[in-house]
Curated annotation (Swiss-Prot):
Topological domains, Cytoplasmic: 1-38, 93-131, 198-272, 323-363
Main location: membrane
Family affiliation: Belongs to the insect chemoreceptor superfamily. Heteromeric odorant receptor channel (TC 1.A.69) family. Or2a subfamily.
Gene name linked to the record: Or2a
Sorted UniProt keywords: Cell membrane, Membrane, Olfaction, Receptor, Sensory transduction, Transducer, Transmembrane, Transmembrane helix
Subunit-structure text: Interacts with Orco. Complexes exist early in the endomembrane system in olfactory sensory neurons (OSNs), coupling these complexes to the conserved ciliary trafficking pathway.
Any single GO BP term: detection of chemical stimulus involved in sensory perception of smell
Listed name of the protein: Odorant receptor 2a
Membrane topology listed for this record: Multi-pass membrane protein
Length: 397
């Protein structure tokens, strides 16, 4: 039964939900679907929603005259535009996404061949964490969408789901009002699905990288550990040669891990940098909004500002947290090469081990924009910067 479970190991299932979203929103053509029909479907969906939805928000922003309204609309517009840029980036890196899937198949096959229960458990744990992250983001987006709908329903006067400009009179035309709200609801649902995948696939890929590093760490620590099987019918020299071959296989596994990290770096560099820029801009805008509406005692607007501030802060924290986990695991992987039983081994074993240690001394990190490390230290610096800006704005007021 355990062997059957090992055979079913598929770490790419960590991004199963994301892949389905990308297929649904026109980025990845599902198998068996006509290429022409899918292109038409993709262009239609993305033209109607991905392009038109943020343009309507941007147009409304240009017609805003008061500072409080400008800050509120700017917060929503920045968030939506950056979310669409992250979504577009998925299309740009789709070749790398397919390469990751192929590489994961090789690494999964290796884990199944080794067949260690602890390795399999570590990989499945990271898959579950990645899928749980997607479900958490999905719950947040469902709650936000529902809250927007309830807000429109309970308001005594007419109001749109989001402040947008459509060039028609919807205040005095019931037909226009209903049609615009139907479009906004459809666009909001599609955008929420897109954003859910865009916000949760960086931590999902970081979980995959962490899981395979953990599996390799366990594999390396077992190198040179003599078992009852190795003690029976095997000479000491034959055992040492076998251990050397185990090291060579682990070095090949390490090369695959490094290759996976390089591809993930290319995939995550742009969206993570966009998220940092978006968070900084939204946090500063929310601070301005909070300061201006506080005098008007507009508690609803204050709550919305706090929600947006919390949301963008959470998005940065998540990628920094999982990036920090990956760095810690890379350090543990380096330590594993020190902890293996290298003392009894052949000279060529020790030579290969020294070369490998030289390559693993530097901890692995993913960099946003190839510059900003995804770590908890970075998150702390972002929070300090935000507090400094807020204090400066408060004094200026």
């Amino acid at each position: 039964m355990e062997k059957q479970e090992d055979f079913k190991l598929n770490t790419h299932s960590a991004v199963y939900y994301h892949w389905r979203v990308w297929e649904l929103t026109g980025l990845m053509r599902p198998p068996g679907v006509s290429s022409l029909l899918y292109v038409v479907y993709s262009i239609t969906v993305n033209l109607v929603v991905t392009v038109l939805f943020p343009l309507s928000l941007l147009a409304r922003l240009l017609f805003t005259t008061n500072m409080a309204g400008l800050c509120e609309n700017l917060t929503i517009t920045i968030t939506d535009i950056v979310a669409n840029l992250k979504f577009a980036n998925v299309y740009m890196v789709r070749k790398q996404l397919h390469e990751i899937r192929s590489l994961l198949r090789l690494m999964d096959a290796r884990a199944r061949l080794v067949g260690d229960p602890e390795e399999i458990s570590a990989l499945r744990k990271e898959v579950n964490i990645a899928q749980g992250t997607f479900r958490t983001f999905a719950s947040i987006f469902v709650f936000g969408t529902t809250l927007s709908c309830v807000r429109v329903v309970v308001r005594p006067d007419r109001e749109l789901l989001y402040p947008a400009w459509f060039g028609v009179d919807w205040m005095h035309s019931t037909r226009n009002y209903v049609l615009i709200n139907i479009y906004q609801l459809f666009g909001l649902i599609v955008q929420a699905i897109q954003n859910c995948a865009s916000d949760s696939y960086p931590p999902a890929f970081l979980c995959l990288l962490t899981g395979h590093m953990r599996a390799l760490e366990l594999r390396v620590r077992r190198i040179g550990c003599r078992t009852e099987k190795s003690n029976k019918g095997q000479t000491y020299e034959a055992w040492r040669e076998e251990v050397y071959q185990e090291l060579i296989e682990c070095i090949r596994d390490l090369a695959r891990v490094h290759r996976l990290r390089e591809i993930i770096q290319r995939v995550l560099s742009v969206p993570c940098m966009a998220q940092f820029v978006c968070s900084a801009a939204v946090q500063c805008t929310v601070a301005m909004h909070f300061l201006y509406v506080a005098d008007d005692h507009d508690h609803t607007a204050m709550i919305i500002s706090i929600v947006f501030f919390s949301a963008v802060t959470l998005e940065v924290f998540v990628i920094c947290y999982f990036g920090d986990r990956m760095r810690t695991q890379s350090e543990a992987l380096c330590d594993a090469f020190y902890d293996c039983n290298w003392i009894e081994q052949l000279p060529k074993f020790k030579r290969e081990l020294l070369f490998t240690l030289a390559r693993t001394q530097r901890p692995s990190l993913i960099y946003a924009g190839n510059y900003i490390a995804l770590s908890l230290e970075t998150f702390e610096q972002v929070m300090r910067f935000t507090y400094s800006v807020f204090t400066l704005l408060l004094r200026a007021k």
